[in-house]
Protein backbone atom coordinates (compact mmCIF):
# COMPACT_ATOMS: atom_id res chain seq x y z
CA UNK A 1 0.00 0.00 0.00
CA UNK A 2 1.21 3.49 -0.78
CA UNK A 3 2.55 5.32 2.33
CA UNK A 4 0.34 8.33 1.60
CA UNK A 5 -2.82 6.25 1.84
CA UNK A 6 -1.52 4.52 4.95
CA UNK A 7 -0.87 7.87 6.64
CA UNK A 8 -4.33 9.14 5.78
CA UNK A 9 -5.95 5.94 7.06
CA UNK A 10 -3.84 6.24 10.21
CA UNK A 11 -5.06 9.82 10.68
CA UNK A 12 -8.66 8.64 10.28
CA UNK A 13 -8.10 5.81 12.77
CA UNK A 14 -6.49 8.12 15.33
CA UNK A 15 -9.40 10.55 14.98
CA UNK A 16 -11.86 7.69 15.39
CA UNK A 17 -10.07 6.47 18.51
CA UNK A 18 -10.05 10.02 19.85
CA UNK A 19 -13.77 10.26 19.19
CA UNK A 20 -14.35 7.06 21.15
CA UNK A 21 -11.98 8.04 23.96
CA UNK A 22 -12.87 11.70 24.54
CA UNK A 23 -16.61 11.48 24.09
CA UNK A 24 -17.37 13.20 27.39
CA UNK A 25 -16.32 16.66 26.11
CA UNK A 26 -18.17 18.21 23.21
CA UNK A 27 -15.16 20.23 22.00
CA UNK A 28 -12.92 17.17 21.81
CA UNK A 29 -15.62 15.19 20.03
CA UNK A 30 -16.11 17.94 17.47
CA UNK A 31 -12.37 18.23 16.84
CA UNK A 32 -12.03 14.48 16.33
CA UNK A 33 -15.03 14.48 14.01
CA UNK A 34 -13.46 17.30 12.01
CA UNK A 35 -10.22 15.32 11.77
CA UNK A 36 -12.14 12.35 10.44
CA UNK A 37 -13.87 14.50 7.83
CA UNK A 38 -10.61 16.09 6.70
CA UNK A 39 -8.88 12.74 6.30
CA UNK A 40 -11.86 11.48 4.28
CA UNK A 41 -11.67 14.63 2.15
CA UNK A 42 -7.98 14.10 1.41
CA UNK A 43 -8.58 10.42 0.63
CA UNK A 44 -11.43 11.15 -1.80
CA UNK A 45 -9.37 13.90 -3.43
CA UNK A 46 -6.48 11.50 -4.00
CA UNK A 47 -8.79 8.82 -5.37
CA UNK A 48 -10.52 11.34 -7.65
CA UNK A 49 -7.20 12.58 -9.00
CA UNK A 50 -6.05 9.03 -9.73
CA UNK A 51 -9.20 7.82 -11.51
CA UNK A 52 -9.71 10.82 -13.85
CA UNK A 53 -13.46 10.20 -13.92
CA UNK A 54 -15.62 13.32 -14.32
CA UNK A 55 -18.35 11.86 -12.09
CA UNK A 56 -16.10 11.28 -9.09
CA UNK A 57 -14.45 14.72 -9.25
CA UNK A 58 -17.46 16.32 -7.53
CA UNK A 59 -17.28 14.00 -4.48
CA UNK A 60 -14.54 15.91 -2.59
CA UNK A 61 -16.47 19.15 -3.00
CA UNK A 62 -19.67 17.56 -1.68
CA UNK A 63 -17.76 16.10 1.27
CA UNK A 64 -16.20 19.49 2.00
CA UNK A 65 -19.66 21.11 2.00
CA UNK A 66 -20.94 18.49 4.46
CA UNK A 67 -17.88 19.04 6.66
CA UNK A 68 -18.49 22.80 6.69
CA UNK A 69 -22.15 22.28 7.61
CA UNK A 70 -21.17 19.84 10.35
CA UNK A 71 -18.66 22.31 11.77
CA UNK A 72 -21.17 25.16 11.72
CA UNK A 73 -23.89 23.13 13.43
CA UNK A 74 -21.42 21.76 15.98
CA UNK A 75 -20.10 25.22 16.81
CA UNK A 76 -23.63 26.62 17.16
CA UNK A 77 -24.55 23.73 19.44
CA UNK A 78 -21.40 24.22 21.51
CA UNK A 79 -22.07 27.94 21.94
CA UNK A 80 -25.69 27.31 22.85
CA UNK A 81 -24.84 24.64 25.41
CA UNK A 82 -21.97 26.60 26.96
CA UNK A 83 -24.12 29.73 27.26
CA UNK A 84 -26.98 27.79 28.81
CA UNK A 85 -25.13 25.42 31.14
CA UNK A 86 -21.63 26.91 31.38
CA UNK A 87 -19.87 23.65 30.53
CA UNK A 88 -19.32 21.28 27.63
CA UNK A 89 -19.66 17.92 29.35
CA UNK A 90 -21.92 15.71 27.29
CA UNK A 91 -22.82 13.26 30.06
CA UNK A 92 -24.26 16.04 32.27
CA UNK A 93 -26.63 17.26 29.59
CA UNK A 94 -30.01 15.78 28.86
CA UNK A 95 -31.16 17.50 25.69
CA UNK A 96 -34.34 15.43 25.48
CA UNK A 97 -36.00 17.34 28.33
CA UNK A 98 -38.80 19.72 27.44
From Swiss-Prot:
InterPro entries on file: NADH_UbQ_OxRdtase_chain4L/K (IPR001133), NUOK/Mnh_C1-like (IPR039428)
Domain of life (superkingdom): Eukaryota
Keywords of the record: Electron transport, Membrane, Mitochondrion, Mitochondrion inner membrane, NAD, Respiratory chain, Translocase, Transmembrane, Transmembrane helix, Transport, Ubiquinone
One GO location term (cellular component): respiratory chain complex I
UniProt GO BP: ATP synthesis coupled electron transport
Recorded topology in the membrane: Multi-pass membrane protein
GO MF terms held by the record: NADH dehydrogenase (ubiquinone) activity
Reactions it catalyzes: a ubiquinone + NADH + 5 H(+)(in) = a ubiquinol + NAD(+) + 4 H(+)(out)
EC number: 7.1.1.2
Positions of transmembrane segments: 1-21, 27-47, 61-81
UniProt-reported outcome of changing residue 53 to F: In strain: Isolate 661nigra
Subcellular location: Mitochondrion inner membrane
Transmembrane helix recorded as keyword: yes
Pfam families reported in the protein's UniProt record: Oxidored_q2 (PF00420)
Keyword Lipid biosynthesis in record: no
PANTHER family: NADH-UBIQUINONE OXIDOREDUCTASE CHAIN 4L (PTHR11434:SF0), NADH-UBIQUINONE OXIDOREDUCTASE SUBUNIT ND4L (PTHR11434)
Function: Core subunit of the mitochondrial membrane respiratory chain NADH dehydrogenase (Complex I) which catalyzes electron transfer from NADH through the respiratory chain, using ubiquinone as an electron acceptor. Part of the enzyme membrane arm which is embedded in the lipid bilayer and involved in proton translocation.
Quaternary structure and partners: Core subunit of respiratory chain NADH dehydrogenase (Complex I) which is composed of 45 different subunits.
Family that this chain belongs to: Belongs to the complex I subunit 4L family.
Stated name of the protein: NADH-ubiquinone oxidoreductase chain 4L
Organism name: Macaca nigra
Amino acid sequence: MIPTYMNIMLAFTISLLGMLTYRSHLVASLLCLEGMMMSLFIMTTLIASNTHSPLINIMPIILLVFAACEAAVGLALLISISNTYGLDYIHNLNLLQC
